[in-house]
Every structure is written in structure tokens, then in C-alpha cells.
């Protein structure tokens, strides 16, 4: 795992200033129908409308623009199932530097197309963490590119936290709780830092697929438990919780696991009621709130809709 100095709340503020000229300030959406369904006051942070179609542009942009000129000259490299790769490609394009993305077999076609569209070089590998990291290391050796890890990178973590900084300003009321999807932990740990900076009394809840529930198990056990084979429709949440991400989150967040049926049902609601094209990973946050209505009843809840890169020919409710 990548070794790094853990970022702090002030790093989120620095990231916000660094990416201000490049990232979109996405809207916060409200719906009376959604409030009635949930029994809570829901504030949806629409990161699926971010550049690249996902929150991950924030972290990638912060990482790319934090490089000095000598580092930037050789470009950047990462491994990604889609959204982070597309985000890094777009961020690298904004600075005019090379980008290499290692992609596992079976990645969503729409996400691969987004990576390629922004000029990155794609390198294929087997769909395992070991294969991803080995191919990344090879590309680094051959090109001199700087590794920008999808979630275990201080610059990325800080950048992801800027979405919640915006959410807190835009909500128009003090939020009681913020719910974000949990995969590798970049968004989750960045959100924690943002809350520590701007709303220390706000609760952080992580929404996670039951078929890839390593974050929930790790937080409950007090140590990383990442020996699992993911089985979930949420392709963006299949990665294992990172070491630095766990170090930040341990003892400071709780997790709710939701099965794929609940996630797909929540995704349909977001499409039909909120009129937003989001991917399954985004829908976990609404599924989590609906799974525990008593916990959220009457509360002001921020939900980060993490991305909207979907394959329209393979929507989850179309499967036999």
C-alpha cells in the first residue's frame, strides 16, 4: 500500500482553493417527494454532474495541480475501474500532461470510453488488486509517471472532501448527518476531514454494498479486514478499504450495508423521482437512509450522489 502522511482538515481548504478554477460547483437538489418517502429532510449533492461524471475529478484535479513542474513533465499514472481513471485523464488534460490508466478486464464500457475520450493511454490487466498494482509499477518504471492512487493518496483524499465543504455551504441549514458511499475510502475519509473542518458536530455515515462490506466489517473489528471477493452491482465500490483511509475513519464513522436489490430500487427512485441519471454506487446512500428510517427521521441529511457513468444498454433493472 502507498505510504503517505495523513491529510488533515486544513488540506481540504487548500484543495478547494487549488481546484476552484477547474472543478464544477455542483448543485444540491431537494425533493418533497423524497422527503416524504424517507421521513427526513434530504439534501442531494449532485456529484454525478461533476466534470467527468463523478466526484473523483476533485481528488484527481487536486493531485495533478499539486505537482511541481519536474514531476508534471512525466505525467501521471493510476489504476481504476473507471471513474478515477476518467477523472485523472481529464485533470491531466487540463494541465497538458500525459496520463496512463491501468484498467481491469470487465470494466464498464461507458467508463473506459470516458477515459479514452480525454486522451489517456489505457493499459489492460487482470481484475485483481495485485495485477493492477503490478502493471502500475511497470508503467511508472517505463515512463517516470507519478502515481496518483485512487484513494490512498493525501492529495486525492483532500480533494474529495471539497464536495462536502460545498454541500455544507449550499444546504441552507445545519446538517445533522452526511451519508456517502464507501469503497476504497477516498470520498469517505475526505468527507470526514471536511466535517472536522466545517461541521464537527455532524455525523458521518458510510453506505456500502452487502456484497463488498469490508469497510463495515473493518470499522466494527477495529482493524482492516479486506480479504473478500466483491459481489455487487456497484462496480465503483468493489475496491478494498485503503490503509490510510481506515486510519482516518476508524472510530469516527459508522457504516450501513445494503443489498443490491435495495440499491437498484433506490437507483430507480433517483431516476424516476429526482430525475437524475446516477449509477448504482450513488444509489447506496439513499438505500441506506431508506433501510433505517428511524435513524434518520426528521433529520437534515446530506447525501453525496457520487457518480453518473452508466451503461445504458446494461441497466441493473434490465437484467434477467
Regions found by a protein language model. Give the residues of each.
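PLP-dependent amino-acid enzyme catalytic core
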Residues: 1-320
